[in-house]
Curated annotation (Swiss-Prot):
It is found in: Secreted. This lipoprotein belongs to the group of structurally related '30 kDa proteins' that comprise major protein components of the fifth (and last) instar larvae and of pupae. It comes from Bombyx mori (Silk moth). Residues 1-19 form the signal peptide. Belongs to the 30 kDa lipoprotein family. Transmembrane segments: none annotated. Keywords: Lipoprotein, Secreted, Signal. GO terms for cellular component: extracellular region. This is Low molecular mass lipoprotein PBMHP-6.
Length: 256
């Protein structure tokens, strides 16, 4: 009886040892990278990427990025920019959606909202301020072209968003309107948090889009539900909860 019990204990120990030594699956590796990004341990995440590439496991990085975007993690953009500025450009180019590279290289882009498929532009108003609107028809003129300039602070990346035609930056108004939303307009300077925006990636029906938030007010950029006479819609900073609704509040960022 003692011998049988001893053999049983040895068998259990052997199984435990084998489990400890078993190679980590790609799913486990992807989850480890995912969690490092979620909790903001970017140096650890970058080190994991280097390790996975040495092991020829680039698909693990791609899977982790996919999970981050599908779950709408804001840290995704911060992590990608950390890679971009710390000798990880090829990782971003190879394993992140193309939109990240387009934004980081400051290419000219268009912002098109998902809900209405309107392209963002600036238009003149009577008081000579330029107001942001979504254009219902124009998708090709320079009026709908923009450039993102990154600003890195405390491991967070923000962007100044400039109209390439008007050379003005998007800024959120100080004053709330009747619906508690704020007007978005153009400004020749970009020296306050009201001029800074951050991007939260999202995925809807396999499309990569972005919620565009203002740094000062944490309001998300959207278009008015009411149309003007020309079928354009005024751009607003919306203060309500939008998570989980990319089909209503997210934007495509595509090359111009």
């Amino acid at each position: 009886m003692r011998l049988t019990l001893f053999a049983f204990v040895l068998a259990v120990c052997a199984l435990a040892s084998n489990a400890t030594l078993a190679p980590r699956t790609d799913d486990v590796l992807a989850e480890q990278l995912y969690m490092s990004v979620v909790i903001g341990e970017y140096e650890t995440a970058i080190a994991k990427c280097s390790e996975y590439l040495k092991e020829k496991k680039g698909e693990v990085i791609k899977e982790a990025v996919k999970r981050l975007i599908e779950n709408g993690k804001r840290n995704t953009m911060d992590f990608a920019y950390q890679l971009w500025t710390k000798d990880g450009k090829e990782i971003v180019k190879s394993y992140f959606p193309i939109q990240f590279r387009v934004i980081f290289t400051e290419q000219t882009v268009k912002l098109i909202n998902k809900r209405d498929h309107h392209a963002l532009k600036l238009i003149d108003q009577q008081n000579h301020n330029k107001i942001a609107f979504g254009d219902s028809k124009d998708k090709t003129s320079k009026k709908v072209s923009w450039k993102f300039t990154p600003v890195l602070e405390n491991n967070r990346v923000y962007f100044k968003i400039m109209s390439t035609e008007d050379k003005q930056y998007l800024k959120l108004d100080n004053t709330k309107g009747s619906s508690d939303d704020r007007i978005i307009y153009g400004d020749s300077t970009a020296d306050t948090f009201k001029h800074h925006w951050y991007l939260e990636p999202s995925m809807y029906e396999s499309d990569v889009m972005f919620f565009v938030y203002n740094r000062e007010y944490n309001s998300v950029m959207t278009l008015d539900e009411d149309m003007a006479a020309n079928e354009d819609r005024e751009a607003l900073g919306h203060s309500g909860e939008v998570s989980g609704y990319p089909q209503l509040f997210a934007w495509y960022i595509v090359p111009y």
